[in-house]
């Protein structure tokens, strides 16, 4: 009985590990594209060119988080162990949680979601698995 329980525990541990690591094949130009989008976002923050319904004091905070997101995606992309979907999703979840209280309007949430979809597209991930939809629809709740 102990051997059965032990082997069940070991199999469960290995299966959970296997589910936690989904390697991503990142396109060759991803690093350059992420650096470009990060620089563009920094310029928008500094110059304040992009229109929005957000209060003026919120815009620099929002852009700082967007720049941090691009920086995080760059760091994940450059990992020696290789990037994983879960690492990108973890970064996405953390940043969306920070942005949630700052972006109450649906139109602004849609713009933010488009930015993150661009980041995901750059690194070769087709879907946010509902994360961006949940973020955008959170404005209605």
Can you annotate each of these PLM segments?
Residues 1-4:
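Positively charged n-region of N-terminal signal peptides that target proteins for export
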Residues 20-74, 140:
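Short terminal alpha-helical segments
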């Amino acid at each position: 009985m102990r051997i059965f329980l032990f082997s069940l525990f070991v199999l469960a541990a290995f299966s959970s590990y296997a589910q936690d690591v989904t390697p991503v094949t990142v396109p060759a130009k991803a690093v350059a594209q992420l650096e470009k989008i990060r620089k563009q976002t920094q310029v928008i923050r500094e110059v304040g060119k992009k229109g929005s319904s957000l209060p003026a004091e919120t815009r620099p905070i929002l852009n700082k988080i967007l720049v941090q997101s691009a920086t995080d995606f760059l760091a994940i992309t450059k990992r020696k162990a290789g990037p994983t979907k879960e690492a990108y999703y973890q970064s996405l979840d953390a940043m969306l949680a920070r942005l949630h209280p700052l972006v109450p309007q649906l139109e602004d949430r849609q713009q933010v979601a488009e930015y993150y979809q661009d980041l995901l597209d750059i690194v070769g991930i087709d879907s946010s698995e509902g994360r961006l939809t949940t973020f955008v629809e959170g404005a209605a709740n």
